[in-house]
Regions:
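N-terminal Rossmann-like FAD-binding beta1-loop-alpha1 element of flavoenzymes
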Residues: 2-32
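FAD/FMN-dependent oxidoreductases across multiple families
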Residues: 190-191, 216-290
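Flavin (FAD/FMN) cofactor-binding and adjacent substrate-gating region
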Residues: 53-83, 101-102, 119-131, 193
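N-terminal FAD cofactor-binding segment of flavoenzymes
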Residues: 21-27, 32-74
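Redox-cofactor binding/interface segments in oxidoreductases and associated redox assembly factors
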Residues: 9, 148-152, 264-266
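Short beta-strand to alpha-helix junction loop
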Residues: 79-101, 152, 216-224
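Long, low-complexity C-terminal extensions of enzymes
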Residues: 284, 288-391
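Predominantly flavin-linked oxidoreductase catalytic cores and closely associated redox partners
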Residues: 106-240, 257
């Protein structure tokens, strides 16, 4: 049985990105990726803000320099426009095709599709030094051994402050419309249990991605989100020829990440931005740094990296989510205030993890203080997370 140097569980965004960065080093290490899907399809969408052209912007099929916010209660609309930053749309299939093609140029890296990991055991490696161990992974197809394991599968169960549930439709419109501006958060409205809005990407003059999104204390079912998305399309009188495909997902916001006996990537490593759910560029940054860490060390890593200390942005995100959870009826007010007072470039820097300390202070003062002060002075011992299973 072959023993691999590195085994990556999951060939999604994080797993493929790590393998891609490893192959860029021309490594001679034997690496295998185990992916449960039979084949890659255009199953999701990644969006991000960027000011410089790079590989990811070149793979994107659409970008905008304008995005807007809208609240239903008073029909207030705030529009951002940037001369520096652009908002990019990257279909998953473009990413999968590029990454798998690049990975296959290195004969030391293999990708195994339709492979589900059922059991992982850790044991001493008899042919190695006494301090080294080997992992053995049982799958539906074969048994694999590896000196290092990186698990990039999403954590299926965990405590989270909030859950972002969404259902989206790629729609072919009956009539053409402007495709210059993204409806980033439109039709915002709240009740005492959740905050909801519509997210609309005009991919062409006759093709849009329409997503209905809700922030709630528990994940919402696909059937419910589909029903609400359909209702929104009717309410807004969006006339369409046909629905090309659909997307459904649940993003944990403020996930309490469980400790692991081996390395983790993607959502398990904290790639999801707590307050927004944006993850794509964070995953690329992690993959670049972690691939170099794996290669440069003369001996194999024996323990997963220590949990990172909370920085100011993490603290801000946590307070933000606790405030939305405590009083969801304030959500629209908070987001409209943020959109109105934080101009396009500041907003883009903050959303893309490139904000300075001054930027963070400006973000703080752009929002109404009272809801956050109420959260700060509320009972700190009161449980704030929910234990839920999500797919």
């Amino acid at each position: 049985m072959r023993t691999y140097d590195i085994l990556i569980i999951g060939g999604g965004c994080a797993g493929l990105s790590l393998a891609y960065h490893l192959q860029k080093t021309n490594t001679h290490q034997k690496i295998v990726i185990l992916e449960s899907r039979e084949q890659y399809t255009n199953d999701k969408t990644w969006c991000f803000w960027e000011k410089n052209e790079n590989l990811w912007t070149s793979l994107a099929t659409k970008h905008w320099d304008q995005w807007s916010f809208h609240r239903d209660s008073d029909h207030q609309t705030i529009q951002h426009q940037s001369q520096i930053w652009k908002y990019y749309y990257l279909p998953a299939i473009k990413y999968y095709e590029y990454m798998t093609k690049a990975i296959r140029t290195n004969s030391n890296i293999s990708l195994k599709m339709n492979t589900q990991v059922s059991k992982i055991t850790k044991e001493k490696a008899p042919l190695l030094t006494p301090s080294e161990t080997v992992y053995q992974l049982e799958t539906n197809n074969d048994t694999y051994r590896a000196l290092e394991v990186v698990d990039t599968r999403p954590q299926k169960k965990g405590e989270s402050l909030l859950f972002q549930s969404f259902y989206g439709c790629h729609i072919e419109l009956q009539a053409s419309q402007s495709d210059d501006c993204v409806a980033l958060m439109h039709n915002m409205r709240t009740d005492h249990t959740s905050f909801r809005f519509n997210y609309i990407l005009p991919l062409s003059k006759t093709h849009i991605l329409f997503e209905h999104t809700r922030f709630a204390s528990e994940p919402l079912s696909e059937d419910l989100m589909k029903k609400e998305c359909t209702s929104e399309l009717k309410r807004l009188r969006i006339k369409h020829q046909k629905i090309l495909r659909t997307e459904y997902g649940i993003l944990p916001m403020g996930l309490n990440i469980k400790p692991s006996q081996f390395h983790t990537g993607g959502q398990r490593q904290g790639a999801l931005r707590d307050a927004s759910g944006y993850a794509f560029l964070r995953i690329q940054k992690w993959a670049d740094a972690f691939s170099k860490e794996l290669i440069k060390r003369s001996s194999h890593l024996t323990k997963p990296p220590k949990k990172r200390k909370k920085d100011l942005q993490k603290i801000m995100d946590t307070l933000f989510l606790k405030t939305l959870k405590r009083a969801p009826q304030n959500s629209s007010k908070i987001f409209i205030s943020l959109a109105k007072n934080a101009k396009a470039d500041l907003f883009s820097r903050f959303m893309s993890d490139q904000s300075s300390l001054i930027d963070k202070i400006r973000i703080i003062i752009s929002m109404p203080p009272w809801p956050f002060l109420q959260t700060l002075f509320s009972n700190p011992l009161q449980p704030t997370t929910s234990q839920k299973t999500y797919d």
